[in-house]
Amino acid sequence: MKPNIHPDYHQIYVVMTDGTKYTTRSTWGKEGDTLNLDIDPTTHPAWIGGSQTLVDRGGRVSKFKNRFGNLGV
C-alpha cells in the first residue's frame, strides 16, 4: 500500500438504541469516539418485520409533507 494516502483506521464505540455498547474499528470520527445509532438491526423494520415507522431527524419529512402533501398521490 502507498504510505500516507489511507484514512486513519481506529477503535470507536457504537451505542445501539437499546443502550448496548460495543467496540469496532472504523475510519469514522477519532480514536475513542462514540457513535449513537438512531436505527439499528434491533429496530429497523426491514430486519424485524414490523410496521413502517419513520424517524424524522431534522424535520426533513415534515418539510417535505408540508411542501408536497397536497398533491393527493
From Swiss-Prot:
Tree of life domain: Bacteria
Ribonucleoprotein as UniProt keyword: yes
UniProt GO cellular component terms: ribonucleoprotein complex; ribosome
Keywords annotated in UniProt: Ribonucleoprotein, Ribosomal protein, RNA-binding, rRNA-binding
GO molecular function, one term: rRNA binding
Secretion signal span: none
GO biological process: translation
Pfam families: Ribosomal_L31 (PF01197)
Matching SUPFAM superfamilies: L28p-like
Subunit structure: Part of the 50S ribosomal subunit.
Family that this chain belongs to: Belongs to the bacterial ribosomal protein bL31 family. Type A subfamily.
HAMAP family: Ribosomal_bL31_1
Job of this protein: Binds the 23S rRNA.
Protein name: Large ribosomal subunit protein bL31
Gene transcribed to yield this protein: rpmE
